[in-house]
Design a protein with these regions (language model features):
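Extended, folded cores of ATP/NTP-driven motor/assembly subunits in large transport
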Residues: 1-285
Length: 285
């Protein structure tokens, strides 16, 4: 948890990437990859050249023993003559509600992700998780706190969100988001749905919010195997479900959308369409 807390400091320091000129990229990526024909999992960061000094300064100030090395040759997850598949992470519920964060885990959630990569064959299989970070242009904290104040006054959470008119398609109101199973009723009887909503919104607004694209790409000799690799990696995100808040779901891409996905993946471009508003603690997790 100490390391994860330090990563949260790193992301906070990288918020200044927003001070970029209009014609320059204002985002960076962190990637976990297992290239085809290589049995070593790579942790990779891609930063615009004009922000390289910022990145190195942030990393070395927080992790003084870290070694930052320029990698001029990019990795390649794609199997020659094979099939490649990809998906974007989306939020299953309203983004005002947070996913489960690292401070509530009794184990390192990263180990579960690493385990899925370790099962991929050295030759004939490759995969990557690419997270693109970009400063949010919208003041989510202010908007979410406005909704929070209404809920604290007794306005039902779904009504408070509707009244805010905030976020358009991003703010899809979940139906029965607070419905509980019979097994959970005893545990929750002391908490009303509104008190749970208040706690979750307070957690969401507890640290700055950025935008993130989360892409998962996989490649193998057959589509079935590529789909299996993709499914296994997607499943590793299940541990991040907050039963009273939010969870990740994944949109599989096909045809033209898949072509655009791999273009954006290869060039590490940011997609506004698949932007997820996540606070720094969620991103760290």
């Amino acid at each position: 948890k100490d390391v994860l807390s330090s990563m949260e400091q790193f992301y906070a320091g990288m918020l200044s990437i927003s001070g970029t000129k209009k014609h320059e990229k204002a985002h960076f990526t962190i990637e976990l990859a297992l290239p085809d024909k290589i049995d070593e999992i790579i942790l990779y960061a891609a930063v615009p050249n004009h922000k390289r000094d910022l990145f190195e300064k942030q990393i070395l100030s927080i992790f003084p023993d870290a070694h930052v090395r320029e990698q001029k040759n990019d990795y390649n997850i794609f199997v020659e003559g094979g099939i490649s598949v990809g998906s974007y992470a989306t939020l299953a519920r309203n983004p005002i509600f947070p996913i489960k964060t690292y401070d509530t885990f009794n184990h390192d959630p990263f180990n579960v992700v690493l385990n899925t990569f370790s099962k991929i064959e050295t030759e004939g299989g490759g995969a990557a998780i690419q997270v693109v970070f970009s400063p949010a242009q919208t003041n989510y904290i202010e908007e979410y706190k406005g909704i929070l104040r209404k809920v604290q006054k007794g306005v039902p959470v779904k009504e408070a969100i509707k009244e805010s008119g905030f976020g358009g398609a991003l703010l899809k109101v979940a139906i029965d988001i607070f419905s509980s199973t019979s097994k959970k009723k005893d545990e929750e009887k002391k908490l009303s749905p509104d008190s749970i909503a208040i706690e979750n919104i307070q957690n969401k607004t507890g640290s700055p919010i950025m935008h993130a694209n989360i892409r998962i790409a996989a490649s193998a000799h057959t589509k079935n195997r590529a789909d299996d690799i993709l499914s296994d990696i997607e499943s590793s995100f299940n541990q991040l479900e907050n039963t009273h808040g939010n969870k990740f779901s994944f949109e599989r891409l096909s045809r033209g959308k898949l072509d655009l996905f791999f273009k954006d993946f290869s060039f590490r471009d940011y997609s506004e369409k698949y932007a997820l508003p996540l606070n720094l603690r969620e991103m760290t997790t």
